[in-house]
Amino acid sequence: KKSWPFHNHHVSEEMFLILDGEGILRYGKNNYPLKKNDIIACPTGDRSVAHQIINDSDGDLKYLALGTKNAFDICEYPDSDKILTRGTSENNSELWNISKGKESYDYFEGEE
């Protein structure tokens, strides 16, 4: 059971406190066992700090998730090669864009 895909943030930091249960922290290229009272810090960075909490047990895995709520963030999803770009304005309107791969376009493409 997974709450979100394997990902890393370029702007927002996350921290998790395991309240109850057991599971696995997938972090970078490694897996680490999780148990009650563990604290996990997930800094910003490249795919080497990508992370995911996985409940591989038969019981519940309860945790508290804390994070910085920045107006802008870029998230990478290494397993699917997707990139999420998210921005929030002062009036809380949001713009999300999910793209795949590293395809890029000229600034004026399609604008003529």
Set out the residue ranges of the language-model regions.
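Conserved short histidine dyad/triad with adjacent acidic residue
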Residues: 1-9
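Short coil/loop residues immediately preceding or within conserved phosphate-binding loops
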Residues: 3, 13, 48
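Short beta-strand His + acidic residue motifs that chelate non-heme Fe in jelly-roll/DSBH
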Residues: 25-26, 42-43, 49-57
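Short acidic-glycine-tyrosine-enriched beta hairpin
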Residues: 15, 28-45
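Short hydrophobic/aromatic patches on the structural cores and recognition surfaces of FHA
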Residues: 21, 37, 53
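Short, conserved beta-strand element in jelly-roll/cupin
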Residues: 9-26, 66-68
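Double-stranded beta-helix
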Residues: 54-112
